[in-house]
Swiss-Prot record:
Organism: Paracoccus denitrificans (strain Pd 1222)
Pathway the protein contributes to: Organosulfur degradation
Pfam families: Aminotran_3
Record carries keyword Transferase: yes
Role: Converts hypotaurine to alanine and sulfinoacetaldehyde, which desulfinates spontaneously to acetaldehyde and sulfite. Can also catalyze the degradation of taurine into alanine and sulfoacetaldehyde, which is stable. Has 2-fold higher aminotransferase activity with hypotaurine as the substrate.
Modified positions (N6-(pyridoxal phosphate)lysine) in chain numbering: K287
EC number: 2.6.1.77
Top-rank taxon: Bacteria
Lineage of source species: Bacteria, Pseudomonadati, Pseudomonadota, Alphaproteobacteria, Rhodobacterales
Keyword ATP-binding in record: no
Protein name in the entry: Hypotaurine/taurine--pyruvate aminotransferase
Family as reported in the entry's similarity comment: Belongs to the class-III pyridoxal-phosphate-dependent aminotransferase family.
Length: 459
């Protein structure tokens, strides 16, 4: 098939998109009167659309994914070379890039030993849920089957992962959901539920209260984001994670850390949990693993977890009876190997720390200038600014005005994000997650655009 792509006329591409593509998270009624945006090319942190307009991308592909930036020829070359050698074999066997990336990944994750490949963050998390249920059936007599999740966290788009969605608007109309998934309170100190000095410990103690209410012998695992993403860019309060770890050990509850957003450098360490001294049983990751150059996700476990599935070889049902077809595609791990090399060789973890500090400093300066900013939060290049109608009452800013800020930044040529269709009444946080290659000039342009937008929208 020959594609007629005239670089000077992309109207037929836009027409094909409008006629046939069902876009994610989009109300298509708007496309009866306006064209959908079609991106054509990317380089570094810059994007160009079908009209030729240039944008600075402050959200790494819209969903915190393109960690090393666009246009990485070395990743594309590595994928091409691998695909002509061996493109695929099912995950029941091994491949060279699968083995090599697993080894390199585990070297970055002390205490973890095994890597299970699949395609998306939703899948990676669902694998854990299945593992927890199988462990409950084989090792706990069917008990310890419940999985706890946190208000405001998000873990995926399948029915089971939506059952653990702490973002209610993501789950509306997709139920009923399966049993055994139980919510625990959020840990956003800006909107704290208890007027105490040691809020972090109190928020963690609330998890223990849920465990005791449900019965410790029924709870098998808890899934948590190290830094909550779409629920408002929530960094954990002091003392929170240490207490969570203690509670998990006290009640023999497996700790599942969802690194789908934070993983591979986003917070300034290889993984977000490493910022807080956590020792997890499961770690899941996707987005930044290959920076969007190939589809890959990983479910990483300890040897203790792995051994629970090989202790009875005479039982033909004892192993993990799961498969993910495209978890066997070699493009994922070979892209991930090169992605990891780039992060190391270019010092992107250190850059993330430095540019993250600059981003937070700039946002805090904007908070001094604009009273609509109620709180600034973040870790590394993963930052948010919560907009409020009134600082004293912390009344959330109207969602339409928050989206007007996003739209004005877009009009200036800067793509930022905001919590969207997640939390009823609380979709009021601007979200920034630029590529780990961001420069000081990039950061300043992003925050200057926000400054201009806030001035215009709230004049």
């Amino acid at each position: 098939m020959t594609l007629d792509l005239n670089p000077n006329d992309m109207s037929h591409v836009v027409a094909a998109d409008r006629a046939h593509v069902w876009h994610h998270l989009s109300q298509h009624k708007q496309y009866e009167t306006i064209d959908p945006r079609v991106f054509v090319e990317g380089k570094g942190m810059r994007l160009w659309d079908a009209t030729g307009r240039e944008f600075l991308d402050a959200v790494s592909g819209g969903v915190w994914t393109v960690n090393v930036g666009y246009g990485r020829e070395s990743i594309a070359d590595a994928i091409r070379d691998q695909l002509v050698k061996l493109n695929y074999y099912a995950g029941a066997a091994g491949t060279v890039p699968g083995a090599i990336f697993a080894q390199k990944l585990i070297e970055k994750m002390p205490g973890m030993t095994r890597v299970y490949y699949s395609n998306s963050g939703s899948e990676a998390n669902e694998k854990v849920y299945k593992m927890v249920r199988q462990i409950a059936a084989r090792h706990h007599g069917g008990k310890k089957w419940k999985i706890l999740y946190r208000d405001r966290d998000y873990h995926g788009t399948t029915i089971a992962t939506l059952a653990t969605s702490g973002q209610d608007q993501r789950a509306i109309a997709y139920g009923p959901f399966p049993d055994g998934f139980v919510r625990v309170p959020h840990c956003l100190e800006y909107r704290k539920q208890w007027d105490v000095e040691n809020y972090g410990e109190r928020a963690a103690d609330a998890i223990e209260e849920v465990i005791l209410r449900e019965g410790p012998d029924t709870v098998g695992a808890i899934v948590l984001e190290p830094v909550t993403a779409g629920g408002g860019v929530i960094t954990p309060p002091e003392g929170y994670w240490q207490r969570v770890q203690e509670i998990c050990r006290k009640y023999d509850i497996l700790l599942h850390i969802d690194e789908v957003v934070c993983g591979l450098g986003r917070t300034g360490t290889w993984f977000g949990y490493q910022q807080y001294g956590i020792e997890p049983d499961f770690v899941t990751m996707a987005k930044g693993v290959a920076s969007g150059y190939a589809a890959i996700s990983c479910t990483v476990t300890t040897e203790r977890v792995f051994e629970m599935f090989k202790d009875a070889p005479e039982d033909g049902m004892s192993f993990f009876r799961d498969i993910s077809t495209f978890g066997g595609c070699t493009s994922g791990p070979v892209a991930a190997i090169e992605n990891m090399r780039i992060i190391e060789d270019e010092g992107l973890l250190d850059n993330t720390v430095a540019m993250g500090e600059r981003t937070l400093a700039n946002l805090n300066a904007l908070m001094e200038k604009h009273k609509v900013i109620g709180d600034v939060r973040g870790k590394g290049l993963f930052c948010g600014a919560e907009l409020v109608a009134d600082r004293a009452s912390k009344e959330p800013m109207d969602e339409k005005k928050v989206q007007a800020v996003v739209a004005d930044c877009l009009a200036q040529g800067v793509i930022i994000g905001a919590t969207n269709r997640s939390l009823p009444g609380f979709n009021n946080t601007l979200c920034l997650s630029p590529a780990l290659i961001a420069t000081a000039d990039n950061i300043d342009r992003i925050t200057d655009a926000i400054d201009n937008a806030l001035t215009k929208v709230f004049a």
